[in-house]
A protein has these predicted regions:
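Bacterial N-terminal signal peptides that target proteins for export
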Residues: 1-10
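Hydrophobic h-region of N-terminal signal peptides that target proteins for export
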Residues: 12-20
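Eukaryotic helix-grip
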Residues: 21-213
């Protein structure tokens, strides 16, 4: 069970048939866990026994600050658990191409290259931010012996102002990290990884270097 949680925590941190819609707008979403102010939803994913997940929670920082944390891909090795390697291959105004390798120790390392597409728009009390990513392994390093190459890793972060100094964060993900075992176990353990992700981002958002000036 620990190895499933570790893998999920990583792929979450890097890291569509992904939607940032409210749970009430799609009857397929079902609440599966609530912990530490984070509500996690799941729904079936066509053609797979694995499920898509969406988590909604509040972060005590502005949306701009939280986005700076998520945008700090180069720094993931210092605050995203188990991240062994993370580098930017290409950064443009509205996208990032990044290679990431995660090392949960209890199974072999996993790696992938992602293309993250970024956008923002004005809303009440500031800007909302949306980052969406999908695999782009063909634009990254070749597969390495002994490292499992992840080919399914799609997700998004939606960050919305939620009052003074607060952000409503919606994280969505569908991934297959290549771990064997019953699908229901992998789906259950995924919720643990998502909670770890929120905890890491909440903690990092307190770092003064990300604060809005």
């Amino acid at each position: 069970m620990k190895r499933e949680a570790a893998i999920t925590a990583f792929l979450a941190g890097a890291a569509l048939s992904i939607f940032a819609a409210e749970p009430g707008q799609n009857a397929d979403w079902k609440a599966v866990k609530q912990s530490n102010g984070v509500v996690i939803y799941s729904r079936p994913h066509g053609g797979s026994n694995l499920k898509e997940f969406k988590a909604v929670g509040e972060i005590d920082a502005t949306a701009e600050t939280v986005h700076k944390v998520i945008d700090d891909v180069e720094g993931y090795t210092s605050f995203m658990p188990y991240t062994a390697e993370c580098r930017v291959i290409e950064r443009k105004r509205d996208s990032i191409l990044t290679y990431q390798r995660v090392s949960p120790k209890i199974v072999s390392d996993r790696d992938y290259t992602l293309r993250i597409r970024q956008e923002s728009w004005p809303v009440e009390n500031g800007l909302a931010y949306l980052d969406r990513w999908e695999p782009a392994n063909e634009h990254g390093p070749a597969a390495k012996p002994g490292v499992f190459r992840v080919t399914v890793c799609e997700g998004s972060w939606l960050l919305e102002p939620a009052g003074e100094g607060k952000t409503r964060a919606t994280y969505s993900v569908f991934t297959d990290s290549g771990i064997g075992g019953p699908a229901f176990l992998a789906n259950t353990i995924s919720t643990t990884g998502i909670n770890k992700l929120f905890a890491a981002v909440r903690k990092q958002a307190k770092n003064p270097k990300y604060q809005t000036k």
